[in-house]
């Protein structure tokens, strides 16, 4: 984890087959500004002082720990396919 200029804690990034993930711990004061019943847009979470590269989406609310914001973004096509971009016409075995 790393600390930002605003005492927020940014997790290391982790991923699955579809997405890259990270979570951000905000301060108690900032957690009071987080909407209770909906996800935030990029404009909203940036206005709270969260700093990340473009493309991250606030994707989940974890009720017991409202000060932990969960983010994800799609993996790039080259990461999903191991460096080879596949055409949409490929037939796969399932």
Swiss-Prot record:
Membrane spanning residue stretches: none
Subunit structure, interactors included: Forms a homohexamer that can probably bind six kinase subunits. Interacts with cdk-1.
Biological processes per GO annotation: cell division; regulation of mitotic cell cycle; regulation of mitotic cell cycle, embryonic
Effect of inactivating the gene: Worms exhibit defects in the completion of maternal meiosis, embryonic mitosis and arrest in embryogenesis.
Role description: Binds to the catalytic subunit of the cyclin dependent kinases and is essential for their biological function. Has a role in the exit from M phase during early mitotic cell division. More specifically, thought to act by degrading B-type cyclins that causes breakdown of nuclear envelope and exit mitosis.
Pfam families xref list: CKS (PF01111)
Family, as annotated: Belongs to the CKS family.
Chief place of localization: nucleus
Subcellular location: Nucleus
GO cellular component, one term: cyclin-dependent protein kinase holoenzyme complex
GO molecular function, one term: histone binding
UniProt entry keywords in alphabetical sequence: Cell cycle, Cell division, Mitosis, Nucleus
PROSITE patterns: CKS_1 (PS00944), CKS_2 (PS00945)
Impact upon substituting residue 10 to F: In ne549; reduces cdk-1 binding
Tree of life domain: Eukaryota
Biological classification of the source: Eukaryota, Metazoa, Ecdysozoa, Nematoda, Chromadorea
Protein name as it appears in the record: Cyclin-dependent kinases regulatory subunit
């Amino acid at each position: 984890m790393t600390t930002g200029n605003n005492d927020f804690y940014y997790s290391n990034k982790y991923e699955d087959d579809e997405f890259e993930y990270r979570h951000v711990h905000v301060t108690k004061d900032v957690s009071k500004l987080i909407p209770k019943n909906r996800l935030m847009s990029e404009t909203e979470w940036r206005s709270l002082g969260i700093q990340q590269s473009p493309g991250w989406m606030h994707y989940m609310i974890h009720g017991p720990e409202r000060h932990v914001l969960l983010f994800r973004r799609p993996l790039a096509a080259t990461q999903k396919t191991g460096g080879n971009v596949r055409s949409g016409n490929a037939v796969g075995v399932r």
